Every structure is written in structure tokens, then in C-alpha cells.
């Protein structure tokens, strides 16, 4: 729904006012697994006869390899019910893993375990994981199939209450997304994945991990009080303090303790380092920040964020916990948390920074300052790292205090010094004291450098490489770049980690900002006044000086220039700038996060030389057409020259045997690629948007270790060489929008490791070679927009591992081969926009198909009767199939079908009967089915139906509601603009969330209109009308209405039903209102109402808008004003309206209407003089409504 809402009511209070309204809302927090003291890491629930000798033993072995000891009830004597020892084991396990196998339901013991596990999940926050072993999750969920047969036998003779508990537990367990063994080619890989998931959960536990953080509990307690988690408002707080004080640690501990109480959560760390400022394109920077936020928050890697409103759209109704760590600019906050309105009720945003002014500038009122620890706490912190306990070992008491004093109170310095002295003798400590005294001078940099000085030369060199060039790389990447160094990479990294100079996390190298600064300062001091004599250059001014004045030397091995740091002017690089840098190995001129700013680096006289020892060449927007003539790429590991003026890389056939990664994307003038004869180690080749590239060299076939080839938008590429068939290790091939590509070579079928093929937008492609059937590992094929493609090869049926096949807008495709019925693993088939497609083949064997898209297949006249065999199909799109005459009656036999879209099927006259067989159908859309006359009466028997859209069905006469006294719960019925609809409604709406839209249905009879208005459960509706019905107690003409109530109802929660008639308005806005709760007048407050999105649309005259809202009465007389807004701009005026009161009171949650309930469960809507009236309500005794 749009970020706006429907109406704003302004309420002015007169006369009576309660002046003693002040309190605070409190509620019990949901259970969190983080608050438990777990006895076991993992509890395994399983049916022994199915898994003990196979799956279970392999899981145990993998767990043992990873140091995980699960609780398994092998040794327990089993009786009629699970005993106290097993109950204790279940309740005392942090994670429960349920191995659901075919005979799991045959054991009462297993079923009782399952009930207890699901109870612990609900009450204790226990993490529950599921593994479906040779069993369909749907069979478990619905107790059907072989699983259901076994389960039913177990239920025979059991009490009904027990059976219902078992069923509920099985359904709940099956709804947990778990591993399905049938989806894994290799069971061992599945078990490794399970073990990793368990390890991740166990490693994300603060119960023991944070014991060494002295004073952490005091910090988190203070911050939790600022967060006020019991309030439903959205709140931002700041954590402020100097670098190295422990802000990041505190925020992580806090996040770990609280994240289970929120729907979504994320920690965005190192923001200052990863997204530095300033930059030339601030908007692109904001988009990238927001993409990072959403990718982590909703766990979707390839998020598309086209504008800065996406975060609000995706998160406005989600309760989130967000930690933004190391923020140093308002731009960063504007991109990720500009306003509390971006997030759903109850959300908490924690901003961690060193800049107090930044917090205040962003309007953050609640700020926690992290102070230095006391002397005793500092000693404890030091001892935790030096001795592994909070006090000194015997005999080390005095010397430990001395070192603590010298190291200062900064936690980072205490950690580094403690790690350095760990396991040293007292004599070694004593020898270190004099050096420490002379080098520290109360400066944390000296403390850190003291630890650095203790390293061997090789480890020092590795430390400087990382701080200056590789601090955000993965370990294996660093190993490749430094392969020629004599140091043992893994051993060196471990030494640095042991001394707390870096950390190794899931294969990534992480380093504290102060340690990075230490390394940069060490390098800077190698030659303060002559930067060309240093090992590394990272400072913009220093680099400019060296490149323009030819002052580089053989000492220099790395240059890293972030071009966004060049704020003014350009850099004119001398022709001989690199001539003296004969040992240069790493050269990086780059723009941050794709910021394609103006040209900054120029070579007016060209370039005569680049070091032959280069291992990394990363030069974006390189201004010349070729690299220097004498350039030798023999040692190159990675070359990235995106967005450059290159026409070719170099002359001749140079050896590139060490090359692993090549990226020449957006080199629009590139006509020639280098010879790949020696590129046997090349793994990735990216050539995106190389518009002048006509062909690939035949030598590409020698790159036999190539894993990914990306040729997106190479619009001049006519063909691929036949040698492409030699790339037997290729896994991904992207040819998107290669609009000149006519065909693929017949040798293409030899690329047998290929898993993903993207041909989308290859508008000239005439055919796909039949040899594609040989690629047995192929899982995804995308050929959207291949408008010249007439048919698919019949061999496509041999790709039995195919899961996704997209042929969207293949307008010439007339039919699909019958062999497609062999694609038994196919899950997603998209044929939308295939205008020439007349019919589908039998898809009876495609039993795993979940989504079928056939929208705008305007020539399609029928569906195959065998569609009923696609038993897992849950979504079917047939929108715009204007020639579709009928649906096969078998369609309702697809019991898993949840969504069916038939919008614009203008030839469809009726739906098949027996629609009630589609028991899981939730959404049925028939909008603009102009030939449809009536709905089958049995449609109202589908209890799960939640959305039915028959709007603009101009011929629809009857909904067949009369014979069905109860419609499905929570139904949204949209019958707007059904101009022929003549409907009697003789039914009862049970659920208060029902939404009805009969806008412009002017033939709707008066009985039906009265029933909709007067049914207490129907809270949201639009229906035709010219006056406000007499049902509404308070009615008025004008722009306001005064409500008078007896004083005894003060501080009661009242539900109001309103009816509004629009006298004028703008109808161009599809969504309108204002998503804001804000104080207006000193004496008044605003109440916000958000209706269903299905009632939003153009503002309509001659129609009545009815809805309900709730508020707390604080005065015996008040005025209501109604208006329609969009982003604070008035769009319409309501001239006639009425209000009817439904009584409620808060003390016992009772009412005269069964639909009425305490208002805060629906809306946080009451604000008065800056105070939340609800606070007072909860602590003020309520008079009974009947007094």
C-alpha cells in the first residue's frame, strides 16, 4: 500500500479535561531464547527405524566434526509418555531439529516430543529447524499421502484432544521452512548445510560469548531503559563515545538480546569505512546504502532500489530492530533511517557514532554516552585477555595493575595489550614494562604500535598489506594476491588474530578502524616528506603529488586511490609516472559503489611504462585506448578496467597464466580481446555493455577453468565461437540483451556443468541448439524477450534438473514441445506475453510446478485437462488471455492452488462448478471479465478465500450470496463498477476485518446497502449512495460534526462507525491520505485512520465511504473534522457525514458489540498535548459502561 492512508480526524476537546493523565505503557516482552541457560546446544527428534543408520549417523558425525554435541534420546527407556528427563532435555536445548520422515507419525513418542518442541518454540523462544527426509512437507502439513496413512493408524483409539494436539504440532512444524532431502542432489551437502546453520545460530548467542565483556550488563540495561520496548511508538536512540570504547560490542550484545522480539533485524556495520564521504554522486551513494540495508533486513541479495522511497515501502508495516554502526554523516542516516515513519510500530533504530552533533542534527533525543571503564573494570578487561579470567593470577597482581595503568582505560588498548602478554612469564612481562613506559605516552596509538613492534618482519609486512590494501578481502582472495610472498598466509593471519590485530569471521578479514589507522600511520612515517618512498600510498594528496611529479620509487608496491576523494580539479599523470615504480604490485584507481563520476585521471602525453610485477590492475575510466606497449601481464591475478576508453588491452599474445578475474565492463569502444591461450586459471570474465565487441576469440576455449562468463548488453555480438564447448567447468553464462546474436554453436551442449543460462533480450535469436539437452546440470533458463524464437528444441525435455524456465514476451513462440512433460523438477514456468502461443502441451508429469505464468497469451484458447496433475501448483496467472473460452473442470482438483488471476479474460463466460474443491484457494481475481454473468454458488464454501475481485465485470448480474448465510472470514470483496450487479445479500459477516467495495454499483438494492452499513462486523466498505443513512446517530452537513457524550464515559475507549459522502475531490490519485500522527492545536490532537488498500483509489462522488475507528474519550464534547489528504495536500472535501457509536471499555475488554476490542490492538492513534492518552488509560481505574 502507498505510504499514505485514508483520512485524518482532527479532534478538539472542550470543557472537561482530566489533568492527571500520566503514566507509561508496559507489557510483557515475548520470550527470547537469549534469556535461557541452555543445557544442550541441540535436541534431535527422529523416528529411529527411518534415519538411525543413515541420515542420523551422518548428522552426528558432521556435528562432531564441528564441535556440536546434540542430545539424542537413544539410551532412554520409552514408555507410554515422555518422562521428566526427556522433557528437561527438550526444554533445555537451544535448538530443536525435527527429522520428519515417512514413519515419524507412527510413533506416539515422536509426536509427544513434537508437541513439546513446538510449545518450547512458542514459550521459550527455542529455535526449531526441520528436515523433511524423503517426505513431502505438504503431506506432513495436511497429514496426507503415505505419511498421513501412518499417522492415522497411530490416532486410532486416542483421545480427540491428543490427536488435535498432534495435528496442530505437525502443521506448525511443516510450516517452518526447512531442508527437503528431495531437493538435494547430494545428501552430504545437505548435512553440511544443516551443520552450518546450527553453527550460525549457536555462534549468535550472547549467553557465554559475551561473558568477558566487563560491565556489559550495565550498559545494556541503561540502553534498554532508553529504548522503552513496551511502547508501540517508533524510537531512535544514539550510542555515542570515542573510537575503541566498545560501542560496537555493546550494540551487538544488545542486538543479540533483543532481536527475537522483532519481525526483522539487521546490523549495518563499518558504515564510515565502507561508505566514505564526500562523493560526487550523493544520490547513488544513498541508493547503495539503502540497498545494503534492505538486502540484510529482508535477506535478499539482489535487491533493486530504484529510488529512496523503497525502504519506507518495504518496512513501514514491519517491526524492525536496526543497528547502524560507525555512522559519520547525515547522508548515511538519510538513506537508511531518515524518519521514524519508515518503520512499523514498535521498531527501534540504534545509531552508533563518535559524533554527538550528528545525532542531534538528526533529531535523536535519546542518547547514551559510553564512558571509560573505572580502574577496577579496566583491570578486569585486561585480565580477561591476559589470563582468561577477571582477576590476575597469583604473583601477577601488582604488575597487572602497572600494565593496566600504562595501557590506559580504552577497552581496545586493554584488549590488545592483554592479548600480547597472554601466556608470557612474569619475567617476560617485566622486560616489556620499560619499553612500554617509553613508547606509550598515554597515547592509544603507541599501545597498538607496541603490539605491532613485537611481530616478526613477515607478520609486520602482512599487517601493512592488509591495513593499506586488503582489509575488506576474503582470506582466499588475499592468498591469491600474496601467493609469491614467503610468509605462510594462514599462519600469519592466525598470529595477527591471536594478538587482536585483526579478526577472522566466516572467511572474512576484519580490522578495527584504529588498527587500520595505525597501519596507515606506520607507512606514512616511512617517509613523511617524500611519499614516493613509502610502501603504500592511500592519501589522495600524496598520490597526486607522486603521479604528477614523477617522484615514485622502487620502494612503492601499492597505490590505492579512491577517485571520489579528488574534490576539485583533475590529476594529469606524467607519461613516466610509473617508470621508477619497478616493484609496483597493486594499483587501484576506483570509484566507490559504482559512482560513475566525471573523468579525473588524465594522461595527456600517454603512458610509457607500468610495472611488469603488477598482480592487481584496477583502473576504472582508463583514458587511453591501450595499455603501454611494453606492458607484461605475466603476474596479473586480477584486471578491472571498467568504463574505460580501451579498444584493446595490449598488442601481441602476452601470457596471462596467473589471471583469475577480468572485468572490462562498460568499455564501449572495446573491439578486441586478448589471446586466452594461456588463461587456464581464469575463473570470471565480465564484459557487460561492451557495445563494439563483435566476437570472442576462439582461444576462449582454452580458459577451461572459467566459471562465469558475463556478456550482458554486448549488442554487437553476432556469434559465439565453437570453442565455447570446451568450457566444461562453466556454471553461469549471461547473454542478456545480446540483440545481434542469431544462434548458439552446436558445441554448446558440451558445456555440461552449466547451471544458469540467460538469453533474455536476444531479440535476433532464431533457435536454441538441440544440444542443450546434453546439459544435464542446467537448472535455470531465462529467454525473456527472444521475439524471433519460434520454437524450443524437443531435447529440452532431457534437462530434467531444470527448475526455472522463463520465456516471457517470446512473441513468435507458437508452441512448446511435448517433451516438456519430462521436466519433473520444474518449479517455475513463465510464458506470459507469448502472443502466438495457441496451446500448452500436456504437463501431467510436471508434478513440482509451483508457479505458471500465462498472462497476455492472447491466442491461448484452452488449458490442458492434465493440469490437475500439477498438484504443487499454487499460483496461476492467466491475465489478458482474451481468447480463453473456458477453464478445464479439473482445475479445481489442484488442491494446493492458492492464487488464480483471470483479469481481462473477456471471452470467459463462466467458471467450472465444484470450485469448493480448491480448498486452499485464497485469492481469485476476475477483474474485467466482461462476459462473466455469475459466480458458482459453491465459491462461498472456500473457507480460506480472502480476496475476490470481480470489479469491472460489466455483465455480472449475481454473486450467488443469498443461499450462503456466512461468507469466508477476512474476505476482501471488490465488486466496484459492476454496473449490472443486482444483488440481494442475505448473509452474515463474522470477521471484523472484512472489506467490501461496491463502488458505482448503482443497481445494488437498498436491502443490501442497509445490511452492509448496519452489520457491526463490516468495518470497511464503499457503496453507492446520495445521503447519509438514518442509522448514524450523529449526522451533519458541512465540514465538522460535534459529538456530545455523558461525562461518565470519560477515559473510555469508544469505537465509532463513520459514513462520509464526498462533495468534491481530485480523482487522479490512486492512493490518498496522510501517514502521520502529529499534534495540531494546543488543545487538540490528530487521530490517524488507515483503511484497507483495496478501498483506496480515485476519489468518488455519489458513493458512501464507511469505516470504523477507535479513540479514548477525554472530553464530554468534541468536534470531528474529516478530510482527504495526500502528503499533506488536501485532495477532497466531505460535505455530509455521520457517526455511530459502538460502546467499549478497557478494564475488562467487554463491549455491547462482539466485534469491539481494545483500540490499541488496531491503531496507536491517540496523542494529546504530546502525551499518549493510552499511558493514562492503562493505569487509571475504568468505570463500567453500565454505571
Curated annotation (Swiss-Prot):
Enzyme Commission number, as recorded? 3.2.2.6
Instruction: Tell me the ranges covered by the NB-ARC domain, including all copies.
Output: 217-478
Which Gene3D superfamilies does this one have? Helical domain of apoptotic protease-activating factors (1.10.8.430), P-loop containing nucleotide triphosphate hydrolases (3.40.50.300), Ribonuclease Inhibitor (3.80.10.10), Toll/interleukin-1 receptor homology (TIR) domain (3.40.50.10140)
InterPro entries in the record = Apaf_helical (IPR042197), C-JID (IPR045344), Disease_R_plants (IPR044974), Leu-rich_rpt_3 (IPR011713), LRR_dom_sf (IPR032675), NB-ARC (IPR002182), P-loop_NTPase (IPR027417), TIR_dom (IPR000157)
Name the residues annotated as catalytic in the UniProt entry: 113
Could you tell me what reaction this enzyme catalyses? NAD(+) + H2O = ADP-D-ribose + nicotinamide + H(+)
What UniProt keywords are attached to this protein's entry?
Answer: ATP-binding, Hydrolase, Leucine-rich repeat, NAD, Nucleotide-binding, Plant defense, Repeat
Signal peptide range in chain numbering: none
> Where does the record place the TIR domain?
38-202
Q: What does this protein do?
A: TIR-NB-LRR receptor-like protein that contributes to disease resistance induced by the Pseudomonas syringae type III effector AvrB. Acts additively with RPM1 to generate a full disease resistance response to P.syringae expressing this type III effector.
Domain comment in the entry: The TIR domain mediates NAD(+) hydrolase (NADase) activity. Self-association of TIR domains is required for NADase activity.
- What PANTHER family does its record include? ADP-RIBOSYL CYCLASE_CYCLIC ADP-RIBOSE HYDROLASE-RELATED, LEUCINE-RICH REPEAT-CONTAINING PROTEIN
UniProt name for this protein: Disease resistance protein TAO1
Native organism is: Arabidopsis thaliana (Mouse-ear cress)
Upper lineage: Eukaryota, Viridiplantae, Streptophyta, Embryophyta, Tracheophyta
Gene name, per UniProt, is TAO1
Amino acid at each position: 500500500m502507498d505510504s499514505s492512508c485514508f483520512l485524518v480526524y482532527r479532534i478538539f476537546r472542550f470543557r472537561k479535561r482530566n489533568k492527571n493523565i500520566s503514566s507509561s505503557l508496559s507489557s510483557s516482552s515475548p520470550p527470547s531464547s537469549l534469556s535461557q541457560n541452555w543445557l544442550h546446544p541441540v535436541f534431535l527428534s527422529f523416528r529411529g527405524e527411518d534415519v538411525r543408520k543413515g541420515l542420523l549417523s551422518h548428522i552426528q558425525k558432521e556435528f562432531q566434526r564441528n564441535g556440536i554435541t546434540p542430545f539424542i534420546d537413544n539410551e532412554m527407556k520409552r514408555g507410554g509418555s515422555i518422562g521428566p528427563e526427556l522433557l528437561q532435555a527438550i526444554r533445555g536445548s537451544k535448538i530443536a531439529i525435527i527429522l520428519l520422515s515417512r514413519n515419524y507419525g507412527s510413533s506416539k513418542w515422536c509426536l509427544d516430543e513434537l508437541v513439546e518442541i513446538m510449545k518450547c518454540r512458542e514459550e521459550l523462544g527455542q529455535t526449531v529447524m526441520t528436515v523433511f527426509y524423503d517426505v513431502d512437507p505438504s503431506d506432513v502439513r495436511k497429514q496426507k499421502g503415505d505419511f498421513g496413512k501412518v499417522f492415522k493408524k497411530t490416532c486410532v483409539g486416542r483421545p480427540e484432544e491428543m490427536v488435535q494436539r498432534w495435528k496442530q504440532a505437525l502443521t506448525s512444524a511443516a510450516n517452518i521452512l526447512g531442508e527437503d532431502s528431495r531437493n538435494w542432489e547430494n545428501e552430504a551437502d545437505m548435512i553440511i548445510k544443516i551443520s552450518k546453520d546450527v553453527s550460525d545460530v549457536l555462534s549468535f548467542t550472547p549467553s557465554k560469548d559475551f561473558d568477558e565483556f566487563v560491565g556489559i550488563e550495565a550498559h545494556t540495561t541503561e540502553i534498554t531503559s532508553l529504548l522503552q520496548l513496551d511502547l508501540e511508538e517508533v524510537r531512535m536512540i544514539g550510542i555515542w563515545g570515542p573510537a575503541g570504547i566498545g560501542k560496537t560490542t555493546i550494540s551487538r550484545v544488545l542486538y543479540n538480546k533483543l532481536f527475537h522480539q522483532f519481525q526483522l533485524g539487521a546490523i549495518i556495520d563499518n558504515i564510515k569505512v565502507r561508505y566514505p564521504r564526500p562523493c560526487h554522486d550523493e544520490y547513488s551513494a544513498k541508493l547503495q546504502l539503502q540497498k545494503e540495508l534492505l538486502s540484510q533486513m529482508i535477506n535478499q541479495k539482489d535487491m533493486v532500489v530504484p529510488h529512496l522511497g523503497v525502504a519506507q515501502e518495504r518496512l513501514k508495516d514491519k517491526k524492525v530492530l536496526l543497528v547502524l554502526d560507525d555512522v559519520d554523516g547525515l547522508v548515511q542516516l538519510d538513506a537508511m533511517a531518515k524518519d521514524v515513519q519508515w518503520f512499523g510500530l514498535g521498531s527501534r533504530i540504534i545509531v552508533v557514532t563518535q559524533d554527538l552533533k550528528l545525532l542531534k542534527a538528526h533529531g535523536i533525543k535519546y542518547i547514551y554516552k559510553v564512558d571509560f571503564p573505572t580502574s577496577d573494570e579496566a583491570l578486569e578487561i585486561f585480565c580477561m585477555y591476559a589470563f582468561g579470567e577477571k582477576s590476575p593470577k597469583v604473583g601477577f597482581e601488582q604488575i597487572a595493575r602497572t600494565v593496566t595503568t600504562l595501557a590506559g582505560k580504552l577497552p581496545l588498548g586493554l584488549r590488545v595489550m592483554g592479548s600480547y602478554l597472554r601466556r608470557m612469564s612474569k619475567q617476560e612481562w617485566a622486560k616489556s614494562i620499560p619499553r612500554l613506559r617509553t613508547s606509550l605516552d598515554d597515547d592509544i596509538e603507541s599501545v597498538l604500535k607496541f603490539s605491532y613492534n613485537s611481530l616478526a618482519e613477515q607478520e609486520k609486512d602482512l599487517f601493512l598489506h592488509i591495513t593499506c590494501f586488503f582489509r575488506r578481502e576474503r582470506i582466499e582472495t588475499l592468498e591469491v594476491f600474496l601467493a609469491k610472498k614467503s610468509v605462510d598466509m594462514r599462519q600469519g593471519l592466525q598470529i595477527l588474530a591471536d594478538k587482536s590485530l585483526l579478526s577472522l569471521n566466516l572467511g572474512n578479514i576484519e580490522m578495527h578502524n584504529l588498527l587500520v589507522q595505525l597501519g596507515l600511520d606506520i607507512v606514512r612515517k616511512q617517509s613523511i616528506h617524500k611519499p614516493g618512498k613509502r610502501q603504500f600510498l592511500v592519501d589522495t594528496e600524496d598520490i597526486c603529488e607522486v603521479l604528477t611529479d614523477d617522484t615514485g620509487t622502487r620502494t612503492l608496491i601499492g597505490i590505492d586511490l579512491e577517485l571520489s576523494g579528488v574534490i576539485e580539479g583533475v590529476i594529469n599523470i606524467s607519461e613516466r609516472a610509473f617508470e621508477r615504480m619497478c616493484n609496483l604490485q597493486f594499483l587501484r584507481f576506483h570509484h566507490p559503489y559504482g559512482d560513475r563520476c566525471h573523468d579525473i585521471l588524465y594522461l595527456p602525453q600517454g603512458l610509457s611504462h607500468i610495472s611488469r610485477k603488477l598482480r592487481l590492475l584496477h583502473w576504472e575510466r582508463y583514458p587511453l585506448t591501450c595499455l603501454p606497449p611494453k606492458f607484461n601481464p605475466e603476474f596479473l591475478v586480477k584486471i578491472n578496467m571498467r568504463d574505460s576508453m580501451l579498444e584493446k588491452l595490449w598488442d601481441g599474445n602476452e601470457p596471462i597464466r596467473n589471471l583469475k578475474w577480468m572485468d572490462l565492463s562498460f568499455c564501449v569502444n572495446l573491439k578486441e580481446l586478448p589471446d586466452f591461450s594461456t588463461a587456464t586459471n581464469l575463473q570470471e570474465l565480465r564484459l557487460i555493455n561492451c557495445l563494439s565487441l563483435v566476437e570472442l576469440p576462439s582461444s576462449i576455449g582454452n580458459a577451461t577453468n572459467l566459471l562465469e562468463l558475463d556478456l550482458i548488453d554486448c549488442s554487437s555480438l553476432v556469434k559465439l565461437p565453437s570453442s565455447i564447448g570446451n568450457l566444461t567447468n562453466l556454471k553461469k553464462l549471461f547473454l542478456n540483451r545480446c540483440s545481434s546474436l542469431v544462434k548458439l554453436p552446436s558445441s554448446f551442449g558440451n558445456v555440461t556443468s552449466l547451471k544458469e543460462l540467460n538469453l533474455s533480450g536476444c531479440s535476433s535469436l532464431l533457435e536454441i541448439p538441440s544440444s542443450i539437452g546434453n546439459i544435464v546440470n542446467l537448472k535455470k533458463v531465462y529467454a525473456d524477450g527472444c521475439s524471433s524464437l519460434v520454437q524450443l528444441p524437443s531435447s529440452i525435455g532431457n534437462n530434467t534438473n531444470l527448475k526455472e524456465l522463463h520465456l516471457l514476451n517470446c512473441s513468435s513462440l507458437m508452441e512448446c514441445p511435448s517433451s516438456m512433460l519430462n521436466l519433473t523438477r520444474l518449479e517455475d514456468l513463465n510464458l506470459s506475453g507469448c502472443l502466438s502461443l495457441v496451446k500448452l502441451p500436456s504437463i501431467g508429469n510436471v508434478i513440482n510446478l509451483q508457479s505458471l505464468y500465462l498472462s497476455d497469451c492472447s491466442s491461448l484458447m484452452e488449458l490442458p485437462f492434465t493440469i490437475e496433475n500439477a498438484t504443487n501448483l499454487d499460483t496461476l496467472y492467466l491475465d489478458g488471455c482474451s481468447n480463453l473460452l473456458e477453464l478445464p473442470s479439473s482445475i479445481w482438483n489442484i488442491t494446493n492452488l492458492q492464487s488464480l488471476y483471470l483479469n481481462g479474460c473477456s471471452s470467459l463466460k463462466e467458471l467450472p462448478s465444484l470450485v469448493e474443491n480448491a480448498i486452499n484457494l485464497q485469492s481469485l481475481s476476475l477483474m474485467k471479465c466482461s462476459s462473466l454473468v455469475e459466480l458458482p454458488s459453491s465459491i462461498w464454501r472456500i473457507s480460506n478465500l480472502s480476496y475476490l475481485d470481480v470489479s469491472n465485470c460489466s455483465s455480472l448480474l449475481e454473486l450467488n450470496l443469498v443461499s450462503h448465510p456466512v461468507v469466508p472470514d477476512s474476505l476482501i470483496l471488490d465488486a466496484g463498477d459492476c454496473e449490472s450487479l443486482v444483488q440481494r445479500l442475505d448473509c452474515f459477516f463474522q470477521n471484523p476485518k472484512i472489506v467490501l467495495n461496491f463502488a458505482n454499483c448503482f443497481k445494488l438494492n437498498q436491502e443490501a446497502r442497509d445490511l452492509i452499513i448496519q452489520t457491526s462486523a463490516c468495518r470497511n466498505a464503499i457503496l453507492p449512495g446520495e445521503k447519509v443513512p438514518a442509522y448514524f446517530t450523529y449526522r451533519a452537513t458541512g465540514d465538522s460534526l460535534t459529538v456530545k457524550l455523558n461525562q461518565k464515559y470519560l477515559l473510555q475507549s469508544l469505537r465509532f462507525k463513520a459514513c462520509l459522502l464526498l462533495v468534491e475531490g481530485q480523482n487522479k490519485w490512486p492512493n490518498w491520505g496522510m501517514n502521520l500522527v502529529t499534534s495540531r492545536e494546543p488543545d487538540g490532537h490528530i487521530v490517524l485512520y488507515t483503511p484497507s488498500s483495496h478501498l483506496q483509489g480515485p476519489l468518488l462522488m455519489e458513493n458512501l465511504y464507511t469505516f470504523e475507528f477507535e479513540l479514548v474519550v477525554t472530553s464530554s464534547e468534541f468536534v470531528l473534522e474529516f478530510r482527504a489528504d495526500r502528503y499533506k495536500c488536501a485532495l477532497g472535501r466531505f460535505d455530509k457525514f455521520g457517526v455511530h457509536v459502538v460502546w467499549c471499555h478497557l478494564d475488562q475488554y467487554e463491549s455491547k458489540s462482539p466485534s469491539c476490542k481494545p483500540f490499541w490492538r488496531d491503531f496507536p492513534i491517540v496523542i494529546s498535548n504530546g502525551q499518549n492518552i493510552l499511558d493514562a488509560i492503562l493505569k487509571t481505574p475504568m468505570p463500567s459502561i453500565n454505571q
